[in-house]
């Protein structure tokens, strides 16, 4: 008589196996790290070829970048130290804070090479930390964008309200410290007009500064900061403010003041009548006026070209070094 009963030990083993199988994850090549992979073998020929190719690409780019940078004509004139009366050179802060003193200063600059229009006019500030956390946060973007939120001044400390408690529009330290030096240019008897339209980012004008938001109580606080604003123009039209409020990442920066749309010839003498209003003396800052042309690469900047040439030259050197080693001491096969 056949007995088909397996007994309790067999049933227990089957149950244990079932439990183990139920906990096993679904098999896939991805989870088991069995995907096909490419493992290139770095032979001397490959390494030499790659370094040579990188050098062949980077060196021409570096040469073209340096050539473009050298074609940019740039005039830089530091005027903060030159535009102080001799009797006040030892007390610069008192000079700049005294509203009764005439701050007009006349500078003459010579054009070193022909400058084709448009010629961009910048002001450059040194040792001005616009990236300071408290400074960067001292603004209210909702207020700048929407007239219905003119009373919102959160985040604008310490320039939130005027002496009578009314909200300041635009509020905050960034707007309060608006750059307010001015420049006018003449060449001989010819006045050079500075075009100040479209000097800011279009996205800022269209989306960050409202066309129906107008200045209120600006520079009416107990301590006057920088420049003033036209009360009859909306914030989206006040491009000097828009340019200034796009804060710089580094303590030395340039901001666009305007464009001169006539050609300047070599050895032309440009007379600059400027108002030295902005206080950089209290923090040992520097002010410079910059006139510059541009190239397909932008303004004058040798760093990019030098960087490409350095990397390309290093790759050529490594390719040559590997070639010498490969032929002098070849690897045994």
Q: What do the predicted segments below correspond to?
A:
Residues 17-42, 84-97, 283-294:
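Membrane-proximal N-terminal segments immediately preceding the first transmembrane helix
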Residues 31-71:
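Internal alpha-helical transmembrane segments
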Residues 67-89:
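Alpha-helical transmembrane signal-anchor/signal-peptide segments
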Residues 92-103, 245-252:
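Extracellular beta-rich ligand/substrate-recognition surface
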Residues 101-242:
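Soluble non-transmembrane domains of integral membrane proteins
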Residues 109-113, 232-237, 241-268:
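Exposed beta-sheet edge/beta-hairpin loop segments within beta-rich domains
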Residues 121, 257-291:
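Extended, hydrophilic extramembrane loops/domains of integral membrane proteins
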Residues 297-333:
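Juxtamembrane interface at the cytosolic side of transmembrane helices
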């Amino acid at each position: 008589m056949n007995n088909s009963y397996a007994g309790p030990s067999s049933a227990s083993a089957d149950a244990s196996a079932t439990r183990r199988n139920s906990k096993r994850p679904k098999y896939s090549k991805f989870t088991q790290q069995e995907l096909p992979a490419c493992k290139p073998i770095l032979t001397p020929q490959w390494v030499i070829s790659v370094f040579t190719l990188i050098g062949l690409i980077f060196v021409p780019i570096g040469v073209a970048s340096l050539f473009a940078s050298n074609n940019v004509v740039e005039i830089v004139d530091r005027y903060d130290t030159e535009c102080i009366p001799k009797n006040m050179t030892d007390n610069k802060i008192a000079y700049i804070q005294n509203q009764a003193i005439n701050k007009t200063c006349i500078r003459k600059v010579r054009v070193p090479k022909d400058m084709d229009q448009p010629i961009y006019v910048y002001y450059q500030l040194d040792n001005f930390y616009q990236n300071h956390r408290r400074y960067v946060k001292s603004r209210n973007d909702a207020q700048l964008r929407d007239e219905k939120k003119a009373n919102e001044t959160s985040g604008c400390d310490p320039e939130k309200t005027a002496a009578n408690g009314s909200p300041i529009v635009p509020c905050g330290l960034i707007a309060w410290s608006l750059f307010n030096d001015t420049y006018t240019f003449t060449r001989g008897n010819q006045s050079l007009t500075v075009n100040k339209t479209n000097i800011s980012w279009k996205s800022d004008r269209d989306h960050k500064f409202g066309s129906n938001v107008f200045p209120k109580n600006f520079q009416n606080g107990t301590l006057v900061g920088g420049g003033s604003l036209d009360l009859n123009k909306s914030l989206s039209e006040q491009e000097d403010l828009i340019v200034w409020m796009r804060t710089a990442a580094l303590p030395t920066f340039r901001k666009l003041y305007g464009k001169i749309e006539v050609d300047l010839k070599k050895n032309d003498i440009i007379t600059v009548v400027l108002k030295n209003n902005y206080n950089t003396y209290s923090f040992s800052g520097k002010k410079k006026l910059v006139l510059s042309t541009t190239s397909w690469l932008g303004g004058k900047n040798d760093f990019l070209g030098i960087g490409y040439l350095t990397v390309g030259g290093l790759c050529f050197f490594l390719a040559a070094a590997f070639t010498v080693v490969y032929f002098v001491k070849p690897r045994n096969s």
